[in-house]
From Swiss-Prot:
This is Protein TPLATE. Residues 1071-1156 form a coiled coil. Disulfide bonds: none annotated. It comes from the Eukaryota. Residues 1088-1149 are annotated as: Disordered. GO terms for molecular function: identical protein binding. Functions in vesicle-trafficking events required for site-specific cell wall modifications during pollen germination and for anchoring of the cell plate to the mother wall at the correct cortical position. Keywords: Calcium, Coiled coil, Cytoplasm, Cytoskeleton, Phosphoprotein. Its main location: cytoplasm. Signal peptide: none annotated. Residues 1098-1116 have a biased composition (Acidic residues). Expressed at the pollen tube exit site in germinating pollen. Interacts with CLC2 and CHC2.
Amino acid sequence: MDILFAQIQADLRSNDALRQSSALLQALQQSAAGRDISVIAKSAVEEIVASPASAVCKKLAFDLIRSTRLTPDLWDTVCSGVKTDLHFPDPDVTAAAVSILAALPAFSLPKLISDCSSEIASCFDSPSDNLRFSITETLGCILARDDLVTLCENNVGLLDKVSNWWARIGQNMLDKSDAVSKVAFESVGRLFQEFDSKRMSRLAGDKLVDSENSLAIRSKWVSSMVDIVWRKRSALMARSLVLPVETFRATVFPLVFAVKAVASGSVEVIRQLSKASSAAAAANATVVDSNAEKLVGVSDLVTHLAPFLASSLDPALIFEVGINMLYLADVAGGKPEWASQSIIAILTLWDRQEFSSARESIVRAVVTNLHLLDLHMQVSLFRRLLLMVRNLRAESDRMHALACICRTALCVHLFARESARRGQKPLPGTDIISLFEDARIKDDLNSVTSKSLFREELVAMLVESCFQLSLPLPEQKNSGMESRVIGALAYGTGYGALNWTEPALEVVEVCRPCVKWDCDGRTYAVDCYLKLLVRLCHIYDTRGGVKRLKDGASQDQILNETRLQNLQRELVKDLQEVNTPRILGRLIWTIAEHIDLEGLDPLLADDPDDPLNIIIANIHKVLFNLDAAATTSNRLQDVQAVLLCAQRMGSRHARAGQLLTKELEEYRNHAAADTVSKHQTRLILQRIKYVSNLPERKWAGVSETRGDYPFSHHKLTVQFYEPSAAQDRKLEGLIHKAILELWRPKPTELTLFLTKGVDSTSIKVPPTAYPLTGSSDPCYIEAYHLADTNDGRVTLHLKIINLTELELNRVDIRVGLSGALYFMDGSPQAVRQLRNLVSQDPVQCSVTVGVSQFERCGFWVQVLYYPFRGARGEYDGDYIEEDPQIMKQKRGSKAELGEPVILRCQPYKIPLTELLLPHKISPVEFFRLWPSLPAVAEYTGTYMYEGSGFMATAAQQYGASPFLSGLKSLSSKPFHRVCSHIIRTVAGFQLCYAAKTWHGGFVGMMIFGASEVSRNMDLGDETTTMMCKFVVRASEASITKQIESDIQGWCDDLTDGGVEYMPEDEVKATAAEKLKISMERIALLKAAQPKKTSKIEEESENEEEEEGEEEDDDEEVKEKKEKEEGKDKEEKKKKEKEKGTFSKLTAEETEHMALQAAVLQEWHILCKDRKYTKVN
């Protein structure tokens, strides 16, 4: 291999173009085979890029550079070579040099563009088609990127040049050369796409913070290109028709985007964002006569595109045209025919099984635009789409498509019903039962076992969609795709609070067979189903039977309630066929809690098919089922649920009470019952007996239905890693994500600007920078980082200032990594070479890295600067100057760098919280998930807060209480605040937060706070120390391990240094000390209190003394006195009773008593701990 590499290097050094090109081809082959060719790349840079060579060799050398890593020194050489090539007389060599601009690293590109702007501009006027093509393609890639926009923001001269370059690219769309025209269309399309998605900037590794100016710059470019395309649309459409058919596809998107921007009016907002002065805006603005002209522009474009849907043979072109016509169908005045034409063409691709690589894209395109079709077409496509979705491989695409389909089903159902109510002819097949009538879907739902997860996804998605429909619909201010859907749903529900229950009722009927499924221990889909069923039973109050017309019930309500009652009867029969032990107890609870016991047929009392008998037989089955393993059933929970059902059913209905008493007596005396269950059963039996004796006091054993489903698919901590539990969690995550993306989408920044206009709150503030060097160091460096959660990347931005009075010719910045960070190109460290640093002139550079997992990580920066850099070494020797070999050596000889001065900087640590994302979750879901999380970390922290007496309590009505001051910064951290409970007497609280790591792990955090009462016991004094107990639970042990490895660091990340960590030993010691002091004080208080005695007692004492002195008193007198005392005592007791329940204790005394009780209780616990430690 060394011989081959030596041969290639020798060929590169020769001046023979043929040998050089074959050597470069060989090197490229070696690179493609995965070998390290950095040695050859160095030779190629020095011998070909930095020297005159043929266009072919230059192109091959640049391809070689792209396929390997170069050092910063070599990149410098490449840049100087490119500068010389831009002046080269052969346009092909210049074209090759221009093409490498897009591959230059972000730290060297801006300077090159600034230095060579005039040469770049002259390339547009070149007679060579190749050079015009190269410059249009390269600039189209670079100019839309974030880093270039930021460069223009800081350099007004460059901004004007780049704006002119965009205008030239726009003109090139009408260029005489087909290749140039096509690539100009692509470049303009890329600018439009980048405006919305920022995809290219992320690929370049620079996700910068959008400032107001950078947004204005990009908006200016976009609005000017939209104007160009709109003004010249007829010429551009004609030019695109003359292009070869295979390149026509590139022309579609720019035309469609610009025409839609003008027709929908969004170009006006883009102009406002660009902040152009009113005169300039007036000069550039397109004068549009009326809406009619806009509509004509749109229909012209549709007429131009439509023939390609029918006649084209290229699947990619049909797809592109179809997608863009759907985009146009959404414009005000767009026709459903445009949408139906496109969707039919796209579905034909599916039928022809062409374009199979884009199956997901085809389905996504169709399902997201279903609402543009008329009702007939939606219904006719429905079953077909359902089968298409079933066959999708990618989970996220399948979920999104399924969410769209479920929403469409609800839309169609509601819309058709409402239209029929308003007197229109009802359309057959629009109800949910008919839409899901397909034989294959029915078979899947009705079979007990199934290998695919699709049926579970379908049931869960339908149910979750119903719950979304029950929530208020999101407001839509702009017209667009979403507003049509929301309009249809609002029309269908008639803005009525309970109209969503009609389609939900049909969903519950369609999905009924799911309770019989055997899903290998998975329960998420069935839990979702039962949750919806419980909600509907609660809303329609099925416990109270079917309401009547004379009670004020409407016909629809009576019909719905009858259907629900019948469904309950069917489910009772299904109890015999339930195949998942976990589900049996839950289904019994769902039915028993809501069934109408009064409405049961008394004639069937002895019949085994009587619903009550079936329910009680299944309760018996759950109570006495000892064989089930802990993994398949949750016996503890099932028994609790069933006992609760028994109590409530027995209290509601006399016959049920009799039957259940027998069952419970048997269970109580059976070995299956543990001690707790026996006690509970005894209590339940007493309640049933009490209610049977006093029927008017049923409330003792029954409570109202709440509509809440108390079970969850989350299993115990021990079972967290079980496959079925993991699949359930994954399915839940996918479904929730798809539902939220569809029903409650987060608006993009652009959408926010288009709807709300320019609002400074939506523009991010750059983060604060931290100095990494000391104030006396010759180079000052400060740094800040930006995290891009989409791609899992972190960018470190450095600002370097030369604090010496000399100009530093060269400064190297080396960046190393620790923890989970890695460079995208796999190199061990990054080096940025900065040249000619003028004194006090700040220079910026950045490093982008990936993050592989949730772990503490940091950047380690080292500065090498060369204050003694000498001049170029002279070549001494008596050779002839003209010798080409000597000339080459002279050119290649490097200037002497001299000895570098090395400056090590402070490490830049990435806070752990930066690797988290807020996870929105409801309190109910949070508390159900909490016990199942296996990894736990607990620690105590303290902080001081200002305030005294009443001001320090949470009882303030207005203004923030000072006692949460130490946790203020939590609001800016990536945690979702699930709920908070504040104790409103002294400062005590419980806060719950939820987050997810970038890699999907769940982190839940609870903070319990208790204010420390100051030294003397009176509450009027200052209470300034807050003790916080932090409990963190996570789905993976590695997460809590990282937190526990440096708890103070984690506290600082969370609270910006507000909370100080207290080790457990200190906590126990301080608690013991405080308790000791408190006990002493209580003893002193008790000793100091004078005994309160009544007058009667004093009198009796006096009498006793007198008796001691005078022994000869009469016994009768004594008896009389005792009787009087007895009467007095009775009267006093009566008076106390008459006073009522008001205590004689004052507030302070009550507080003291409460404190004493708490102190004693804690004292006992500490004593127990001591005994335990002694024993151990």
